[in-house]
Amino acid sequence: MINVYFSDNSCKQFLPGIKGSDIITHLFPELLNKAIAIKINDKSLDLSTEITEDCKFEVITLDSDEGLDIIRHDTAHIMAQAIKEMFPEVKTVVGPTIKDGFYYDFSTDHIFSSNELEKIEEKMREIIKKNESFIREVWTREEAIRFFSNKGEDYKVKIIAKIPIHENITVYKQGSFIDLCRGPHAPSTKISKAFKLTKVSGSYWEGNTNNAQLQRIYGTAWRTEEELKLYLNNLIEVEKRDHRKIGKELELFHIQNEALGQIFWHEKGLIIYRIIENYIRKKLENNGYIEVKTPYLLSKTLWEQSGHWDKFREHMFLSEIDNKVVAIKPMNCPCHVQIFNSKIRSYKDLPLRMAEFGTCHRYEASGALHGLMRVRSFTQDDAHIFCTEDQIIEEALKFCNLLMEVYEVFGFKDILVKFSDRPEKRAGSDKIWDKAEEALKASVKAANLNYVLNPGDGAFYGPKLEFTLKDAIGREWQCGTLQMDFVLPERLGAYYTGSDGKKHHPIMLHRAILGTIERFIGILIEHHSGKLPIWLAPVQLSILTITEDAIDYAISLKHKAMKQNIRAEVDITNEKINYKIRSHISKKIPVLWIIGKKEIETESVSIRYLESKDQHIMSSDKALKTLLSCASI
């Protein structure tokens, strides 16, 4: 008999060879219609898996995230089968699941068009209607290579060559289609009913632009048609809010092929950038941070000492100067340690909170670049706190409180915190890990935040917190981080003299609130759909004239507003007033003052706000005072 343990710590005995589906039938009949796969010792497997030894057993249901991921995995296979039946000459490459869906890469001379997606969907529905079983088989390496070679599936052969020699080669069959796959899959194709193919794009084998170009078809799949409809409606909203589109319309920034992954900030976009930077700078000053500036170009030797050369070299931009290899910095932390090391430090100097708006560069494949969200050149609101072990809790709490204050100001109140604790392989003593982990937990609790545990997912040099924002349409954006580091100060020779007169390495806290300014601006644009809060809007006030007689009054009001640091502009063109109003609303100007004969006579303005069609008259002095009350923070 074998012992099978369950999540409630109970144990049942079964004959070896019992299938996962039989255990569910016997013990969990209420889950029969919801079960899609099982977990044996935390490994996801098919329902038909035979259990031959003692294990921990869990049921994966359709209503779980893992269950939904399996539905999407199934649908990717069904799409590949449909395409192979419609276009036999097409070669399959890889088809993973991704956030909210899946994709599959194909090698073919045929150019897939968006119009063909509906026909592919029809073929997929035919396959689903047949209710074909997903059948798992284990093949020898030789069998797999021979089969896929005979089929001309060269990319599958390349994938097999990279599978470790000790691992089984598994394939899945559904109907006439056979694909290389680890699984798991649902019992049959019938579960994948709510899906939609969304777009076609180019890609490269292994993401390397030097390799042959492939074609990638994206899709999404959900449990029900209702969920699918909700998601597709959300996609329309996402498209409306696309920061690249809004950024162009509002003349904030642009990107061009001569500088891929780098931003050309226009006047209005740079205003937003500077407001955010200066706001964060002031918050840091008020919280005891010093600001520094470090070089962009540093010798390879520093990156070797820090350990980044071995782990991060492929993402560095390298050059050679005076016969020495140099790199544009991809991060600021080793530079901050150099400033710490520039003088003798005492325990009385700690904590030392060192901040930098550090511009960094990292290589990203061109296909991965995405507007402001994924770039090669970016500025971090970076800071490092050098402290003693006894100061960790207080510093972590102060950071969490600061971070929450900032997020609330920018309009984010729904924050998810992920806590990653010690991995098996790690540096530092259990004592310091205990203290660091307790500090992070305590700081999150004191800030009235809940956290999700990522067990064992911390870096080898310390535990971390990740702060994820939920935007106006429910998307999640990971921005803030608090990462403990027990290793880098030691590697780079940082120490302070303790109260005992001995040398000690400081604990280093890597922390950021926004992440990068570029990406955070992209998130803000999409969160607010371009309608930024008044204090953040590049133009806060537009003064529109109805007649020529109003020009002098309008200009005088503009000067009056600008003296109070209001970012104002005046429109004295000959266009009709309704056209002017529409034009400035399309520019997302939060406040319009409309000036005509009546307003001149009464020294007033007619006010219209971006989110309202109503207009009301107010004296110019009162209108300015009202605007000033919300024009800055």
Swiss-Prot record:
- Limits of the TGS domain: 1-61
- Give the start-end ranges of region Catalytic: 242-533
Return the EC number. Answer: 6.1.1.3
What are its GO biological-process terms? threonyl-tRNA aminoacylation
Any note on cofactor binding? Binds 1 zinc ion per subunit.
- Provide the protein's localization: Cytoplasm
Tell me the first and last residues of the signal peptide: none
Enumerate the Gene3D superfamilies for this protein. 3.10.20.30, 3.30.54.20, Anticodon-binding domain (3.40.50.800), Bira Bifunctional Protein, Domain 2 (3.30.930.10), Threonyl-trna Synthetase, Chain A, domain 2 (3.30.980.10)
**GO CC field:** cytoplasm
The record's similarity note reads: Belongs to the class-II aminoacyl-tRNA synthetase family.
Name under which the protein is recorded: Threonine--tRNA ligase
What phylogenetic lineage does the species belong to? Bacteria, Pseudomonadati, Pseudomonadota, Alphaproteobacteria, Rickettsiales
Q: What is the name of the gene encoding this protein?
A: thrS
